[in-house]
């Protein structure tokens, strides 16, 4: 085995360098053998960011223990330290080895096995895999909807609220406001007496996600909603902006745009399902603060024709049964990323 070359060390604690990592999710095109090197490189960057988060949590825990030394009965600090230690330990064991199978008769390379921490808000590797599984599931439903309702057009919608310094307050404001908009749609479509018209009733089905970042210029918390909506009639931007401002009382920023006809629909859906990867755009400290706050929250939602889609919990790929394959094992090395394991661990196996 050749000598591993160390990459120039980059600061993966910064949002700028993290943008390079968050370039996309796995798609069917990346299953091709020729795409494996790029895929491995991206996984390596994801693991490197996870290691940076692990190290941050270790340092963060050390600081909390200093506080506990002077006040050993501070239950809140003790609990915060336990949560950080557990998260760091899970990150440490995530993605150290990747086991791929190359189904050479169809030239596909699939991720067969790996150890995942499933902390997708702080682990970009798990975020990539989770987002990819979600993308696959909803694209499958989208194809069914398109056959059933060929007259529907796809739109990207973004709902925002005014930036603010208090994350829980801003998040709650967005969540309550969006619930009002969804309720208006539901009441109108149900034919409830007195239910007013809403532009959102034009949406036959939608799937979307919540995101949080720092606002450009303000540096304050900027929660927002991204969604793909399917409509027979185009949403009037002016009307829905007016409605949204009336609901929120402080925000009128809504972006409504049709899918680019020169791109595959998967590109539009990808903007929604990259939500977990995008948390890596935050600094490590902000990333951890957001992850703690959103722990247990449902960040993905669906309505109408997209309701009921099941996303598998398993983050590996489905095997191609009865096809022959070669096994490929990769190990992560700090500073150089993933390298293929020693030849003796790559014995070809499969169905004769």
Question: Can you describe what each PLM-predicted range is?
Answer:
Residues 1-221, 231-352:
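Right-hand nucleic-acid polymerase module
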């Amino acid at each position: 085995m050749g000598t591993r070359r160390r990459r120039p060390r980059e600061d993966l604690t910064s949002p700028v360098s993290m943008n390079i990592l968050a370039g996309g999710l796995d798609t069917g095109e990346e299953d091709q053998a020729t795409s494996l090197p790029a895929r491995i490189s991206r996984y390596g960057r994801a693991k490197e960011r996870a290691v940076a988060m692990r190290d941050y949590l270790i340092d963060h825990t050390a600081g909390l223990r200093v506080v506990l030394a002077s006040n050993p009965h501070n239950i809140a600090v003790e609990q915060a330290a336990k949560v950080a230690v557990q998260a760091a330990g899970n990150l440490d064991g995530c993605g150290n080895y990747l086991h791929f199978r190359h189904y050479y008769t169809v030239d596909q390379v699939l991720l067969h096995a790996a150890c995942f921490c499933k902390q997708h808000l702080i682990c970009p590797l798990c975020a990539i895999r989770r987002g990819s599984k979600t993308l696959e599931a909803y694209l499958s439903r989208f194809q069914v909807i398109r056959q059933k309702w060929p007259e529907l057009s796809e739109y990207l919608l973004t709902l925002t609220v005014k930036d603010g310094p208090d994350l829980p307050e801003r998040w709650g404001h967005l969540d309550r406001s969006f619930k009002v908009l969804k309720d208006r749609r539901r009441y109108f479509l149900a034919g409830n007496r007195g239910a007013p018209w809403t532009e959102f009733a034009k949406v036959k089905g939608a799937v979307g996600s919540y995101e949080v970042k720092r606002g450009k210029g303000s540096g304050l918390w900027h929660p927002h909603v991204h969604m793909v909506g399917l409509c027979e009639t185009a949403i009037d931007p002016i009307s829905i902006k007016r409605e949204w401002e009336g609901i929120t009382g402080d925000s009128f920023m809504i972006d409504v745009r049709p899918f680019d006809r020169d791109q595959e629909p998967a590109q539009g859906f990808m903007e929604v399902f990259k939500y977990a990867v995008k948390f890596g755009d935050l600094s490590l400290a902000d990333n951890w603060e957001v992850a703690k706050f959103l722990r247990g929250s449902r960040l993905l939602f669906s309505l109408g024709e997209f309701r009921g889609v099941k996303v598998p919990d398993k983050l590996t790929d489905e095997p191609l049964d009865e096809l022959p394959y070669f096994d490929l094992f990769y190990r992560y090395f700090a500073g150089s990323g993933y390298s293929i394991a020693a030849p003796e661990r790559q014995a070809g196996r499969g169905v004769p």
